[in-house]
Amino acid sequence: EVSSSMTINASGFILLALYVALAKKTGRDLKKITGTIQNDILKEYAARGTYIYPPKASMRIITDIFEWCAKEVPKWNTISISGYHIREAGSTAVQEIAFTLSNGKAYVQAALQKSLDINIFGKRLSFFFNAHNNLFEEVAKFRAARRMWARIMKELGATDPKAMMLRFHTQ
């Protein structure tokens, strides 16, 4: 009935588990639940320094979330790959896109190494970008990111157009 967006990263899997437990307790159909956890640990390492586990263990948790949600909570956005914090940490618009798409590609490659279907988990990836006050630069950034992400996903084996979409929000 209500989509919940949780800006939580290293402990995102715990909050997701609590959310699912509450949904079960209140009789909700997990196949209909919608929401998002940020769950972007690579950004945490690069831009914020707020992480719990080393990168390898963190990537395992993230790909486990991709796999579990695809089966149990298929409308859940399993990650919001964040350029916002990268930009706030001092990057340019170009660097924001470069680092964010690079992180996104790393998540996709980790999921593929786990033999997950890119056309399934790819539809649940989302992005979060910063919008500074140069309107034309920001519009160009978003358009370029959209095209680059589609190409990255296609090169990694996506065939479903929805899996190649760059779904994002900005602030």
Where are these regions (language model features)?
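Catalytic core of soluble alpha/beta enzymes
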Residues: 142, 152
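Catalytic alpha/beta active-site cores
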Residues: 1-138, 156-171
